[in-house]
């Protein structure tokens, strides 16, 4: 089982999935629009799921904006400015006392489609997210392409 969290400008949505994709739990709260409260809310979400299912679980989080590969800072999260210039991956990993995989939401969307979505039979996948903001993700051979 794994926990997936979608951190957005308006909501934080969590899902607990079995390895076969079966959804066991889903929850949604409003984004607090404050960095430390975001860290605290996600930590509480994970702790509550783990308490309910009596397991320590892997956690993956998609977020708006990109991560500067040199500094680890989130940048260009235009509709979630409280995330900008923060080391989100480092901070949430520290708060949860484990390595948490964090990635741009559009990259996660494109990767998901490449593995088990409508693009699973294609070598190259480009996904666009239109929500509170707009973003794109490119996947080639089931690997996210990251660059400037």
Model-inferred region functions:
Residues 18, 63, 140-141:
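A cytosolic small-molecule/anion-sensing beta-strand core signal
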Residues 64-67, 131-133:
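Short glycine-rich anion-binding loops that position phosphate/pyrophosphate groups of nucleotides
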Residues 52-56:
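Short helix-terminating capping/connector loops at secondary-structure junctions
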Residues 2-6, 58-60, 125-129, 135:
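Short glycine-aspartate micro-motif
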Residues 122-148:
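Glycine-rich phosphate-binding loop of actin/hexokinase-like ATP-binding domains
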Residues 32, 36-43, 47, 57-59, ...:
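Glycine-rich phosphate-binding loop and adjoining helix at the ATP-binding site
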Residues 2-40, 73-74, 144, 148:
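Short glycine-rich, Thr/Ser-proximal phosphate-binding strand/loop in the N-terminal lobe
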